[in-house]
Amino acid sequence: MRNLFFIVFLLMVTIDSVAQESFKGYFEPYIDLEYDVTDYYSHEFTVEERTIWYNNNSFNVDVKQLDLAHFSTLALDEKNSVAVGVQYRFEENFVTGEENELRFTEEYKYSIQPKVTEFEQRLRAEQRITSSSTSHRFRYNFAITRALNGPEIDTGEAYIIGDLEILLTVSNTSKPEYEQRIGAGIGWVLSDSIKLEFVTEYRLDDFTQDLGHELFLVTGMKVGL
């Protein structure tokens, strides 16, 4: 209970500290299904919903979008992998004036686990297509995962998550946009095939031109089939 009050207090302080600038708060639940085709090749399907609960000094709950995504991943060895993905974002049904988006993604990932902490670096290139424009986004993500009990994450145990991401978006219709994201959270291994994760992510959106502050509360269930 003390931890809950502390988290709520931090959220309120964050909201108050940036209230004079653009600030938005989101809740983002998702479910992720993954299965291995072979020892080196796997598929991943994700359904994700985004709800806005705070928008510039106003608390109001509205669904913003729904995402459907698929990734195919090929492991090159124990440390390196490549992947391609496709995603469709439904926004027109929820927000007036917004457009649905088709997104293609290419990914390279490098991960190591020298001791109890796993380190992961990920590069992504994305092509984001709407009815009015096409943009290209480039992403670098550094993430850590660490077991809370012992050298490995066993069934019934918790683990901590942290990540830092830098993004650049370019298009013919607007100036380059830079974004910074930082997140931290905790996960639990409920069984051999199910994990739950709760992550708080803070984003600085377009911080070189039109700075916006965004706070995401992300909850996810990962299921291995």
Predicted regions and their residues:
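Short loop/turn motifs that connect adjacent beta-strands in outer-membrane beta-barrel proteins
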Residues: 39-41, 79, 113-119, 148-158, ...
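Outer-membrane beta-barrel "beta-signal"
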Residues: 108, 213-225
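Start-of-domain marker
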Residues: 20-76, 81
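Residue-level signature of outer-membrane beta-barrel architecture
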Residues: 35, 74, 88, 110-112, ...
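Residues that define the transmembrane beta-barrel architecture of outer-membrane proteins
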Residues: 25-27, 62-66, 100-104, 134-140, ...
